[in-house]
């Protein structure tokens, strides 16, 4: 494997300000499994409501499969004017009280998963991150007219909030990079937890703000961060009104929703559909996702011009012996660990 540190550049001055903060890191991907576009909407919401600065930028050109996921291009009259830009960025964020946290967001890597996962894990270790949290939408046989159920999974069972319904047994599913990262974080002894917002399967391809808001509230609960809801309540109200109007136009859809409402109400004691039913729903959703090549653009972040384009292997890299090194000077083959918070 090539050196993971050559996958990114960073801001040395901003890196220094992270000493002693022991932040939470949120990773919200525009990726493989995200029913209701929960993760994407959360990332856009946080970037629009929280102060942020670009700390690390990954070289996504090494991670993206352009033929497998082709960029959208704009042609005007007689020339091309633009193409989708892919990015993966780690930003320093401030919540409503001024508390520092980190946000890793962008398109999930197509290539070099081991190398990218190792790079992110090493950054997490050097930044002395105390907890890694993700959120995404899970396609389920639930109605939009009932409260969004949240289920959790984590690298350690004692990280899981209670109650946490047992929503699935054991099954094999195609992996997304977020899940792959969580697995490797657990192997490295890093605490990581994911928030799964249950999204009606018939809304999996469109934004479902009720689930977005439920996921945000769950994140604030498990992290202690004060994250503003901003306009999410208004977006939820408008979104639900649009869904209700569409349902009212179709007798067939009304019957499906009514059936799901009955099932939901019968399961109010916490029991959920069987693993086979959930597995079938997930497999159907994942099959649909696999057949797509159209790219959904990631939430925009701070301009790349704000980053010090330091040579990742140069003297200013966190693992080199220069003044910007967040750990001790490297005296051997093993890169230094973080000092902050210790």
What is each of the regions a protein language model found here?
Residues 1-106:
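N-terminal short beta-loop-beta anion/metal-coordinating cradle
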Residues 141-222, 226:
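Catalytic cores of processing enzymes, dominated by hydrolases/peptidases
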Residues 57-84, 192-212, 319, 327-332:
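Flexible, D/E/H-enriched segments
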Residues 37-41, 111, 115, 172, ...:
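Conserved active-site and cofactor/substrate-binding residues in soluble primary-metabolism enzymes
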Residues 56, 102-104, 133, 191-196:
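Hydrophobic/aromatic beta-strand patches that form the interior of the parallel beta-sheet core
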Residues 203-342:
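A conserved C-terminal secondary-structure "cap"
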Residues 99, 107-159, 181:
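Internal, conserved structured core segments that host functional sites
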Residues 30-32, 62-63, 107-110, 137-139, ...:
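Acidic, glycine-rich active-site loops and adjacent beta-strand->loop/helix elements
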């Amino acid at each position: 494997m090539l050196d993971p540190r050559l996958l990114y550049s960073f801001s040395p001055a901003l890196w220094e300000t992270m000493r002693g903060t022991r932040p939470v890191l949120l990773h919200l991907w525009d990726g493989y499994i995200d029913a209701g576009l929960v993760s994407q909407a959360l990332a856009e919401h946080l970037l629009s409501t929280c102060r942020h600065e670009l700390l690390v930028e990954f070289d996504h050109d090494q991670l993206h499969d352009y033929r497998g996921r082709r960029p959208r291009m704009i042609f005007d009259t007689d020339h091309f004017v633009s193409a989708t830009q892919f990015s993966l960025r780690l930003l320093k964020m401030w919540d409503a009280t001024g508390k520092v946290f980190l946000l890793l967001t962008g398109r999930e890597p197509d290539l070099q998963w081991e190398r990218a996962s190792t790079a992110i894990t090493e950054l997490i270790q050097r930044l002395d991150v105390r907890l890694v949290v993700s959120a995404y939408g899970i396609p389920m046989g639930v109605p939009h007219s009932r409260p969004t159920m949240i289920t959790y999974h984590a690298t350690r069972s004692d990280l899981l909030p209670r109650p946490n319904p047992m929503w699935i047994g054991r099954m094999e599913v195609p992996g997304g990079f977020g899940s792959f990262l969580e697995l490797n974080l657990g192997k490295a002894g890093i605490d990581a937890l994911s928030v799964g917002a249950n999204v009606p399967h018939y809304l999996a391809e469109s934004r479902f703000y009720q689930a977005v808001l439920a996921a945000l509230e769950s994140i604030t609960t498990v992290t202690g961060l004060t994250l503003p809801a901003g306009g999410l309540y208004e977006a939820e109200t408008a979104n639900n009104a649009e869904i209700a109007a569409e349902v009212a136009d179709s007798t067939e859809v009304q019957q499906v929703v009514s059936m799901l409402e009955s099932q939901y109400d019968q399961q109010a004691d916490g029991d959920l559909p069987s693993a086979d039913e959930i597995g079938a729903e997930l497999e159907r959703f994942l099959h649909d996702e696999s057949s797509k090549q159209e790219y959904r653009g990631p939430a925009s972040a701070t301009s790349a011009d704000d980053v010090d384009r330091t040579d990742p292997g140069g003297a200013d890299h966190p693992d080199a012996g220069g003044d910007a090194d967040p750990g001790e000077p490297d005296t051997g083959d093993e890169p230094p660990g973080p000092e902050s918070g210790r």
